[in-house]
């Protein structure tokens, strides 16, 4: 919901509906684009809708930029049939997906993505996780179509839940299987083979085994 009480509802079929209040038909309906939607978040002002699918995120701009409803949100007035918003797909680069899966031996599976929130604060970042990795996207870089919009941090255990500290996008609250931590976003790194592999453990050092993806390795990638 937004700060004005507008509602966004998603289904396991993958479609999204926007309402300005309960008990009426949706003002805007965005048809299914692929996978089921497993989580949904909305910016406080209602401008942005963030949908989580298993292997990617969808960022939707609900502000109407033309026509008779110019300046209105999709929650307030219906989009014209030929001008419905086109979601931005936020995903990991195929090489990073392959390295993630090589490290975890598990398929990509995002937890519900969230905006940073706070009183009178603007959404500037997005956070989600998959396995032992936390990923944050910069809204500014996403909107500018930058090629490097996300950074990562790896843990030794799977991340159970994550969210930004209220009122700031500088710290992320991380729930692990047996503890809850707060980590500074500045410790996140650009995804590289080294940052995805994480620090070497004594076991790895003794065995001489490398977790880096080799040229002869075969991975099961959805791409």
Region locations from a protein language model:
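Conserved beta-strand element within WD40/beta-propeller blades
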Residues: 1, 7-11, 49-53, 118-120, ...
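Structural signature of eukaryotic scaffold interfaces centered on beta-propeller domains
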Residues: 1-2, 41-45, 96-121, 158-169, ...
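Per-blade loop-tip surfaces of WD-repeat and WD-like beta-propellers in eukaryotic adaptors/scaffolds
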Residues: 4, 12-27, 59-74, 137-147, ...
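Short coil/turn segments within WD40 beta-propeller repeats
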Residues: 13-16, 55-57, 132-134, 178-180
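Surface loop/turn motifs at the tips and blade-to-blade linkers of beta-strand repeat domains
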Residues: 29-33, 153-156
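Blade-level signature of beta-propeller repeat domains, shared across WD40, Kelch, NHL, RCC1
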Residues: 57-63, 161-222
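Long, low-complexity intrinsically disordered regions enriched in Ser/Thr/Pro/Gly
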Residues: 65-68, 103-121, 127, 135-137, ...
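A surface-exposed beta-alpha-beta supersecondary segment
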Residues: 70-111
